[in-house]
Curated annotation (Swiss-Prot):
The protein's name in its UniProt record: Histidine--tRNA ligase
Catalytic activity: tRNA(His) + L-histidine + ATP = L-histidyl-tRNA(His) + AMP + diphosphate + H(+)
GO cellular component, one term: cytoplasm
Family, per entry: Belongs to the class-II aminoacyl-tRNA synthetase family.
Domain of life according to the entry: Bacteria
EC number: 6.1.1.21
Organism: Chlorobium chlorochromatii (strain CaD3)
Subunit structure: Homodimer.
PROSITE patterns xrefs: AA_TRNA_LIGASE_II (PS50862)
Keywords per UniProt: Aminoacyl-tRNA synthetase, ATP-binding, Cytoplasm, Ligase, Nucleotide-binding, Protein biosynthesis
PANTHER family the UniProt entry points to: HISTIDINE--TRNA LIGASE, MITOCHONDRIAL-RELATED, HISTIDYL-TRNA SYNTHETASE
GO MF entry, a single one: histidine-tRNA ligase activity
Localization per Swiss-Prot or TrEMBL: Cytoplasm
Gene that this sequence comes from: hisS
Length: 425
């Protein structure tokens, strides 16, 4: 055993588990493409001030959870990305995407990094898949993005999910609500934990996101942002709910839902699973019209998006028995080398078979024929092809059906034709 271990908060994804990740990723690729979204890939690290301005200086992510470093003493600080949206918007602005077309539908699958206390479904290096719709934030656009997320979960077969929605209004409405929250929580300062006391001064909306059991009754009685909304914001939210109802997407209005990032406005949403504990969210998102201006745009750019935590998603899929027994596709053919001096010839055959689109395997360790046959059966090969001196001389090879034990002598061309005609993927 090596004296080296993976860093705390990280983990290895070995080949069998990697198949599960590919299963989930391929579903997301498929569903996102159905909705017209195209993949974007951004760097794993960005300048630190991108996240400070984009996510918000008062958030826990910026204040406590970022991995930042300064590679050049005279240069700017760099941070491993803790979330994807700011980087996607930066890429859109830098590359003038919205000047090329007024609407962009983008999706991503990527790794992120946060200094969190490692626990089930929450690591310091983790993965998200998500989508961003840039250029439009009408109620129809918001419903489109939410539909994509719920369609993805449905395609995986998930049950027991709750879609929670809320409206955070516009900046003016949130300012009035912030003042109301400060007035409400201030007399109860002594009841607040240290984190909530800090949030009371910087951003009291974050108190609503507290999971501290001792504060839940106090939070439940707090003023509702909904009561500070003006008619335009109310109409916008009601139209989003109308579209969800039209699409037969069930939802619950949660007036305490604020999400953990400062750039959200108007509609915010979150999906939770009854398979998880207190940390029950597996995905969420919302509108973020002002993010572009925070990153240097001359104007706001309407936008809406979501992200799904893939580690938590896999936990739920496993608990609901939706991952099944997924294995790598077996080779169609296992080439059995009868004498080691025939290895070069066998390698040429395998090269030809693979170029012909036939998954083929052979032994590179010089094992006995008996050991090679055991390996062929272990891998689930459909056929074994025997390569020895007499076969090489005649140009015909023994092809054995490992299910029926029937064996026939065929040329390599006939072997390839048989496999193409009678063996499906």
């Amino acid at each position: 055993m090596s004296s080296f271990q993976c860093v705390k908060g990280t983990r290895d994804i070995l080949p069998d588990e990697s198949l599960l990740w590919s299963f989930v990723s391929s579903h997301f690729h498929h569903v996102a493409s159905l909705y017209g979204f195209r993949e974007i890939r951004t760097p794993m690290f960005e300048y630190t001030d991108l996240f400070q301005r984009g996510i918000g200086a008062t958030t826990d992510i910026v204040g406590k959870e970022m991995f930042s470093f300064q590679p050049d003493p005279a240069g700017r600080s760099i941070t491993l990305r803790p979330e994807m949206t700011a980087g996607v918007m930066r890429a859109a602005l830098q590359n003038n995407l919205l000047a090329q077309a007024p609407l962009h539908k983008l999706f991503y699958i990527g790794e992120l990094f946060r200094k969190e206390r490692p626990q089930a479904g929450r690591q310091r290096q983790f993965n998200q898949c998500g989508a961003e719709l840039l250029g439009v934030s009408s109620p129809a656009a918001v419903a489109e993005v939410m539909s994509l997320m719920m369609h993805f979960f449905g395609a995986l077969g998930l049950t027991g999910l709750t879609l929670k929605v809320n409206t955070l209004g516009n900046a003016e409405e949130r300012l009035a609500y912030r003042e109301a929250l400060q007035a409400y929580f201030a007399p109860h300062r002594a009841m607040l934990d240290a984190s909530s006391q800090e949030r009371l001064e910087k951003n009291p909306l974050r108190i609503l996101d507290s999971k501290n059991p001792a504060l839940q009754e106090l939070i439940a009685a707090a003023p509702r942002l909904y009561d500070y909304l003006q008619e335009a914001s109310l109409r916008d939210f009601e139209k989003v709910l109308f579209y969800l109802t039209e699409r037969r997407i069930s939802y619950t209005i949660d007036y305490r839902l604020v999400r953990g990032l400062d750039y959200y406005c108007h509609t915010a949403f979150e999906v939770t699973s009854n398979e998880l504990g207190a940390q029950d969210a597996i995905g969420g998102g919302g509108r973020y019209d002002a993010l572009a201006r925070e990153l240097g745009s001359a104007t706001d750019i309407p936008a809406v998006g979501f992200a799904v935590g893939m580690e938590r998603l896999l936990i739920v899929l496993e608990k609901q028995g939706l991952l099944g027994n997924r294995h790598a596709r077996p080779p169609r053919l296992y080439v059995v080398v009868q004498q080691q001096e025939m290895l070069d010839h066998a390698l040429q055959l395998v090269w030809r078979l693979r170029n012909g689109g036939i998954r083929s395997e052979l032994d590179l360790a010089g094992r006995s024929m008996k050991a090679q046959m055991r390996e062929a059966n272990k891998l689930g090969a459909l056929y074994a092809l025997f390569v020895g001196a007499s076969e090489c001389a005649s140009g015909k090879y023994g092809l054995k059906n490992l299910a029926t034990s029937e064996q026939t002598d065929l040329s390599i061309e006939a072997v390839m034709q048989l496999l193409h005609d009678h063996v499906t993927e």
